[in-house]
């Protein structure tokens, strides 16, 4: 099965209506394994089987069902896809060629590329036309109590 990743963002956010409790959330992007999904409620990462279960996947969309409380009024529920970077299929050097396995493996690679693109688009970046400037931050002890700022000549200070 070939999936169309181009128009599917690997991230969805829900805001639960005030006075309501919601336990079921659609996953409108394709995923392959239940472990491909991360579920956050108000910024807290939840644990699969402890806090939620997943249906669907195997290259299609699905649903996350909260097993305990779910999202309550005003809560923000964010579901992201984060496929583990690994090769799951090994093709034999001779014999029958499994085109279904090849398509699935290629779909996983495209989905991983979409995950990485989503993560990089959410990162602090320089424009393509900026001169080479380092955005490497100082060590944690040097950063403590500091604010990230930019000066008029060299950029980040």
Briefly describe each language-model feature range.
Residues 15-21, 53-61, 129, 152:
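Short, ordered beta-strand-loop transition motifs
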Residues 16, 70-71:
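Hydrophobic beta-strand core residues of beta-sandwich domains
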Residues 36-70:
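Extracellular/luminal ectodomains and secreted, surface-exposed scaffolds of diverse proteins
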């Amino acid at each position: 099965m070939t999936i169309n990743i181009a128009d599917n963002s690997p991230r969805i956010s829900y805001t639960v209506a005030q006075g309501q409790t919601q336990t079921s959330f659609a996953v409108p992007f394709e995923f392959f394994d239940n472990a491909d999904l991360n579920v956050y409620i108000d910024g807290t990462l939840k644990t699969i089987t402890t806090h939620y279960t997943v249906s669907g996947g195997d290259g299609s969309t699905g649903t996350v069902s909260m097993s305990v409380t779910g999202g309550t009024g005003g809560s923000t529920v964010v579901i992201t896809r984060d496929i583990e970077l690994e090769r799951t299929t090994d093709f034999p050097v001779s014999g029958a060629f499994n085109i279904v396995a090849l398509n699935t493996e290629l779909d996983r690679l495209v989905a991983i590329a979409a995950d990485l693109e989503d993560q990089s688009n959410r990162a602090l970046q320089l424009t393509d036309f900026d001169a080479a400037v380092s955005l490497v931050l100082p060590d944690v002890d040097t950063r403590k109590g500091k604010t990230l700022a930019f000066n008029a000549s060299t950029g980040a200070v």
